Design a protein with these regions (language model features):
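Conserved N-terminal Rossmann-fold NAD(P)-binding element of oxidoreductases
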Residues: 11-17
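N-terminal Rossmann NAD(P)H-binding glycine-rich loop of SDR-like oxidoreductase domains
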Residues: 17-27
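Conserved glycine-rich Rossmann-like NAD(P)H-binding loop of the short-chain dehydrogenase/reductase
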Residues: 29-49
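Rossmann-fold cofactor-recognition segment
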Residues: 54-72
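A glycine-rich helix->loop->beta "capping" turn
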Residues: 58-62, 80-95, 99
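Conserved Rossmann-fold cofactor-binding substructure of NAD(P)-dependent oxidoreductases
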Residues: 67-86
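Catalytic loop of short-chain dehydrogenase/reductase
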Residues: 97-127, 141-190
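C-terminal helical subdomain
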Residues: 198, 206, 210-256
Length: 256
């Protein structure tokens, strides 16, 4: 796996303190092609799991503070890599927001729409990733294959929307998809080796999906570790013809 990437390369994971992001950090560190992993989170020092990985893979794991709602933190990490002469071969934006206590919950009807909640969900799911594209895409490796991928969601597909509801989450992921698609077009002109893609991880047993798992069949609820490995397989299979695409965890394309 990851044999399509030049060896060695640096990977950046944004949103790495738990769930799929944490599993991706662990999976990447197990691969010999990966020289360095930059794990970004709002409070990486408070993640026992990241600290354990840091002890185990000392020298190969860099922990950095990034809050997608705080643009200077995104610029600081990208600037630090640039100053060190490091060009990432893989950038993964995994952070996402569906619910947060009682202040942010998925809407079931129009009357549930709230400006503050909408702004918060869009800030994490679309605006933050847009700034990650701004700062990281020009920084990425020019040697061989490089990939910028972000976790979207099937519910962000306009063509696949048959149930309605979840206004903020659906529309913010649709916005993310458009941002990635648009960035892929610019990348073809400016950074021809960089592939840009949206990925759907499937329903994963994480804090994000926990309140909504009751009706999910057991064989459709995946562990973060399974999803991380599957996503890396999908990423490994991507080529320039796939740039600007939207793909599920099993590699199948998803309609916009």
């Amino acid at each position: 796996m990851l044999e399509s990437f030049p060896k060695p390369f640096t990977a950046v994971v944004l949103g790495s303190s738990r769930g799929i992001g944490l599993a991706l950090v662990g999976a990447l560190l197990e691969h010999s092609r990966v020289e360095r992993v930059v794990a970004c989170a709002r409070s990486p020092e408070s993640s026992n799991e990241l600290q354990s990985l840091k002890e185990r893979f000392d020298g190969r794991l860099q922990l950095s503070i990034v809050d997608l709602t705080e643009p200077p933190t995104i610029a600081a990490v990208a600037g630090g890599l640039q100053s060190a002469g490091i060009r990432p071969g893989l950038v993964l934006n995994v952070a996402g927001l569906l619910h947060h206590g009682e202040s942010v919950t998925p809407e079931k009807r129009l009357e549930d729409l709230d400006l503050e909640s909408l702004q918060r969900v869009f800030a994490v799911n679309a605006l933050g990733p847009a700034l990650c594209l701004r700062h990281f895409l020009p920084l990425m490796s020019r040697e061989g294959k490089a990939v910028f991928a972000a976790l979207s969601a099937r519910v962000g597909s306009i063509g696949d929307n048959r149930l309605g509801g979840w206004y903020a989450y659906r529309s913010s992921k649709a916005a993310l998809n458009q941002l990635l698609r648009t960035a892929s077009i610019e990348a073809r002109r400016r950074f021809a080796n960089v592939i840009v893609a949206a990925l759907h991880p499937g329903t994963t047993d994480t804090a994000l999906s926990a309140p909504f798992q009751s009706n999910v069949p057991e064989d459709k609820l995946f562990t973060p570790e399974f999803v991380a490995e599957r996503l890396l397989h999908v990423i490994d299979d991507l080529d320039s013809d796939h740039s600007g695409g939207f793909f599920a965890w099993d590699g199948q394309p998803i309609s916009w």
